[in-house]
Amino acid sequence: MQTPSIIQCGLLNSFARKMTDAISDNQIIATSRFFNIARDVADVVVSNTKLAQQYEQLSIDSLKEYLVSVAKFVAVDYSNTTSADVDDLIHKLRLFIEEECYQYNIDKEETCDGDVCVSDEYNEPAPKPKPKPKPKPAPKPKPAPKPKPAPKPAPKPAPKPAPKPAPKPAPKPAPKPAPEPAPEPAPEPAPKPAPEPAPEPAPIRPARRCDENPSNLETCCTNKALYGDFTDSSCDIVKKKTNWWLWGGIAILVIVLMIGGYFIYKRYFSAPKFENTGEFVNDMNFNNDVNFNNDVNFDNDMNYGNEGIDVSDLEILNLPVPSVSPVPSASIVPSVSPIPRGSPVPSASPIK
């Protein structure tokens, strides 16, 4: 690129500011979208200046193409990629403008070249920094000699434009794939051999019957029942032997208890029996003249209520039956309990 004029430098500064405002919100941007934004911004920058009123359309279009070419030059490193880094693009654009327009003082918003001026109506001036507080005045030193002004640096040569990347060679057409060989027919599966017949199971030995060993019949039947075998007919009714020793012992014990009970009954529970002898009757004769110091006279003719007693009555009372021999009238029926000799028998009737 040739050295730009002051008008082009003013357009470049305005272009850089508007591009920064348009894409600075993103970190990565597609290259195609970056070029579209550059065309729109170039059109706005050129149209909003006074150039549109003083130059022909051909010159205005060339200025637009100049700004677009600058955007392409900045993004040359991303020409083969689909996206680009926004911060890198803005940094390269500012470096390009500094290198191209270092000989011009582009600090004002409006730059004029004769009667032609370039202004940015949409960009406000940068805020001025606040003035620093004035230091206290120091004692004035002696005036030093004024230094000589430094010589202006020689203008830097314009950087050579980067060489355009060589066009990529057209890709060679991919060779046609060789036709695949026809697949070989799958071999027919071999016939499966006939399955061998399963061997016949060995005959099961029949179980022995429990009645073959009568001495262990009950044990054999119990073992079969524990294993769930109830097919033996000899185990349906198991005849139990009679335990004669047990029943004989029970019978002997019963006989002994009966004999012992009989003697106990006769000894303690049966009524005593007395023989009707003359000696017992003579002992029961008492003298009527016995004096008890109370002048009580026991009359032998007193009736004690024993008249009319039959043999059957004595049997009911469990008393001994008197013999056939006549009993003297003075005899008295003995009491159930034995009475010692010489003691009088009181009458059952009240004493008069």
UniProtKB/Swiss-Prot annotation:
Domain notes for this protein: The hydrophobic region might anchor the protein in the underlying inner membrane.
Biased composition (Pro residues): 146-204
Transmembrane segments: none
Domain of life of the organism encoding this protein: Viruses
Main location class: virion
Subcellular location per the Swiss-Prot or TrEMBL entry: Virion
Oligomer status and interactors: Interacts with the major capsid protein.
Region Disordered, annotated ranges: 122-214
Upper taxonomic lineage: Viruses, Varidnaviria, Bamfordvirae, Nucleocytoviricota, Megaviricetes
Region (Hydrophobic): 244-264
Protein name: Minor capsid protein P14
Cellular component, GO annotation: viral capsid
Regions of compositional bias (Basic residues) in chain numbering: 129-145
Function summary: One of the minor capsid proteins that constitute a network internal to the major capsid proteins and outside the lipid membrane. The minor capsid protein P14 does not serve a cross-linking function between neighboring capsomers, it may play a role in the viral capsid assembly.
Natural source organism: Paramecium bursaria Chlorella virus 1 (PBCV-1)
